[in-house]
C-alpha cells in the first residue's frame, strides 16, 4: 500500500524526513516503554523501519513477543503536523550483515562531527536487528497547538495482511548486564526542573501503546502530574511510562486526576552507558566488554558470523539524504543552538 499517495502531503513528508521518532513497545507485563529511535521508512511508507542493537535487543524481543507498537513524530519547524502511528511490527534478524549494511546506508549521516574512521569501529552499535512496522492507524493534528481538537485519522483496510517476524532463535536469550538504575526522584527533579520534553506512553483500548508529548509535568510526593492534550483519544489510565530523551524512563500506573493525569512512579529503568555517558563510538573498556560479549552470544544463537563494517562510509540512501538535509537546515538556521541562560 502506497501511503505516500494516500496521506496528506505534510503528513507523508514528516514521516519521510524525520530522523528520530518516539518508538513504544510493550514489555512482558504489558507496560509500554518508549525509546527515541532513528527512523528510516520505505519510500512509499508501506513500512516504517526502526532498529535496535543486537548487543541490546530488548526492544526487538518485546516486539517479537507482542507486535503491537506505537510511534510519535513531533515537528521541528512551523507548519509541520504532529503524527501518531500504531502498527504491527515484524522483527528481522535472519541476516545481521545485511541489516547492518542497510542501517549504515540509512543512518550513518548522524553525528557528522565524528570521523568515519572512529565510527566504523563501533560494531557493538552497527550490528542491528531491524524492526519493520506496518501502520494500522495514523492520527495527525495540524500543529501542536491543534491537539485539543480531535485528530484526523487514517485506518488500514480490514483485509490488510500484516507480515510476521522472523522466527526467534531456538536457544534462550541472553541476559542484559546490570546497568545503573537511578533514584527516580533525583532524576525527576533534574528533568522537570529543566523543562525537558517529556513523552508519555500508555495503552489504548485495543492494546496498542500510544505516545503523546506532555504539555506540563509537575513533581509530586510519589509521582508526576501531567497535562495532556484534550484531543488525545483513548483511555488515560493503566500501566504507563514517561521518558526524557530515552535516558530517564519512569515506570508506573496512570490515573486521571482533576483534569490532569497522575503517574504513580514505581521505578526508573536502568540507563545504558552509551546514553548516560554520551559515548557510543568509543566507550570505556568496562562498558564495551559486556556489549561485545552479548553481541558474540547473540550472533552464536543465530549461527551467524561477526558482521564486517566497510572501510569506506557507505553511500547514503535517498531517504537518508532528505533526513540529513532537514537536520542541517535546523542547524543552519540556528534552531538547535543552546539558549542563553
PLM-predicted stretches and their roles:
Residues 1-341:
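Binding-site signature for planar aromatic cofactors or substrates
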Amino acid at each position: 500500500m502506497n501511503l505516500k499517495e494516500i496521506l496528506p502531503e505534510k503528513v507523508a513528508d514528516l514521516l519521510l524526513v524525520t530522523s528520530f521518532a518516539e518508538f513504544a513497545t510493550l514489555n512482558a507485563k504489558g507496560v509500554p516503554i518508549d525509546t527515541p529511535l532513528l527512523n528510516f521508512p520505505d519510500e512509499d511508507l508501506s513500512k516504517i523501519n526502526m532498529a535496535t542493537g543486537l548487543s541490546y535487543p530488548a526492544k526487538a524481543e518485546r516486539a517479537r513477543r507482542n507486535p503491537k507498537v506505537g510511534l510519535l513524530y513531533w515537528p521541528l519547524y512551523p507548519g509541520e503536523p504532529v503524527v501518531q502511528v500504531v502498527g504491527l511490527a515484524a522483527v528481522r534478524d535472519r541476516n545481521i550483515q545485511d541489516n547492518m549494511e542497510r542501517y549504515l546506508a540509512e543512518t550513518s549521516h548522524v553525528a557528522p562531527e565524528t570521523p568515519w574512521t572512529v565510527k566504523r569501529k563501533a560494531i557493538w552499535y552497527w550490528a542491528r536487528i531491524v524492526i519493520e512496522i506496518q501502520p494500522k492507524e495514523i492520527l495527525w493534528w495540524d500543529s501542536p497547538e491543534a491537539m485539543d481538537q480531535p485528530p484526523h485519522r487514517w485506518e488500514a483496510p480490514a483485509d490488510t495482511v500484516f507480515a510476521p517476524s522472523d522466527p526467534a532463535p531456538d536457544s534462550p536469550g541472553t541476559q542484559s548486564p546490570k546497568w545503573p538504575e537511578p533514584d527516580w526522584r533525583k532524576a525527576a527533579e533534574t528533568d522537570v526542573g529543566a523543562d525537558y520534553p517529556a513523552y508519555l506512553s500508555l495503552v489504548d483500548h485495543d492494546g496498542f501503546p500510544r505516545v503523546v508529548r506532555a504539555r506540563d509535568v509537575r513533581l509530586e510526593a510519589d509521582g508526576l502530574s501531567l497535562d495532556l492534550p484534550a484531543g488525545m483519544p483513548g483511555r488515560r489510565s493503566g500501566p504507563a511510562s514517561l521518558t526524557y530523551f530515552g535516558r530517564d524512563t519512569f515506570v508506573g500506573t496512570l490515573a486521571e486526576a482533576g483534569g490532569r493525569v497522575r503517574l504513580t512512579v514505581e521505578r526508573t529503568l536502568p540507563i545504558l552507558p552509551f546514553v548516560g555517558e554520551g559515548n557510543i563510538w568509543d566507550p570505556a573498556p568496562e562498558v564495551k566488554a559486556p556489549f561485545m560479549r552479548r553481541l558474540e552470544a547473540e550472533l552464536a544463537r543465530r549461527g551467524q558470523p561477526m558482521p564486517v563494517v566497510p572501510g569506506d562510509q557507505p553511500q547514503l540512501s535517498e531517504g537518508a539524504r532528505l533526513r540529513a538535509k532537514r537536520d542541517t537546515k535546523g542547524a543552519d538556521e540556528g534552531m538547535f543552538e543552546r539558549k542563553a541562560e
